Amino acid sequence: MLVVGVLARFSVKAGLDTEVKQFFENGRVIVEGQPPSTNWFAFRIDQTTYGAFAAFASEDDRTALLSTGGPVSSQAHADLFTGPPTFEMVDLLEVRQP
């Protein structure tokens, strides 16, 4: 059962659509190598605001992904962003899965 998640928000520099898409494609590959992350989504909110969400069955699983996933990758690609991304830890109250 999924009980915790992480919600990340990225404010990106204008005109870097291709680079940002590649950043999230690489993020998906990282997540696929982390079995604890059972659900992962990358999305665009508007032209310069993007996000990612992942859900986990335990706090330990979430911590494992955060130690190798988004925070690490975003530091390596800081030139894409107008400032540091935010990573919010969330508790899942209800989950509907197929």
Language model features with spans:
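Glycine-rich beta-strand-turn "strand-cap" elements at beta-sheet edges
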Residues: M1-G5, R9, T38-G51, S74-P98
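Short, surface-exposed ligand-recognition loops at beta-strand->loop->(often short) alpha-helix junctions
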Residues: S11-Q22
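Short coil/turn motifs at secondary-structure junctions
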Residues: K13-G15, I45, A57-E59
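Residue-level signal for secondary-structure boundary sites
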Residues: L16-T18, D60-R62, V95
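An amphipathic, aromatic/His-enriched active-site/gating alpha helix that lines ligand/cofactor pockets
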Residues: N26-N39, A55-M89
